[in-house]
């Protein structure tokens, strides 16, 4: 039997909510609604090598992923993507880092969807 390792961790949002389950549900819903578009937009910016958009999208994602606990898995990747985009360099490295970000976000989405 294969073991499934979860990528999400709701400890941070649970602590932040202080027992407000509606808040937790709302934050998860926001992640489920917004993250697929964030991934799509970042992927398109990477394909177009639009470093300004890459920088902007990766910066925004850094602030949203802690709510579902995936910052420990992809936070550094997003920091590195933003840094490389700021320097307008490393397109291939950005693509590689993005693949990990995308995979983790897809796993998180699948874990959290109702």
Question: Each predicted region: which residue ranges?
Answer:
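Two-component system phosphorelay core
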Residues: 1-114
């Amino acid at each position: 039997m294969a073991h499934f390792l979860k990528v999400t961790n709701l400890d941070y949002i649970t602590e932040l909510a202080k027992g407000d389950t509606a808040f937790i549900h709302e934050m998860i819903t926001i992640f489920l609604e917004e993250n697929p578009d964030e991934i799509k937009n970042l992927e398109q910016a990477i394909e177009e090598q639009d470093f300004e958009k890459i920088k902007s999208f990766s910066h925004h994602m850094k602030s949203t992923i802690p709510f579902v606990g995936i910052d420990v898995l992809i936070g550094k990747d997003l920091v590195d993507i933003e840094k490389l985009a700021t320097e307008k360099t490393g397109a291939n490295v950005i693509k590689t880092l993005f693949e990990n970000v995308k995979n983790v976000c897809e796993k998180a989405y699948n874990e959290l969807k109702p």
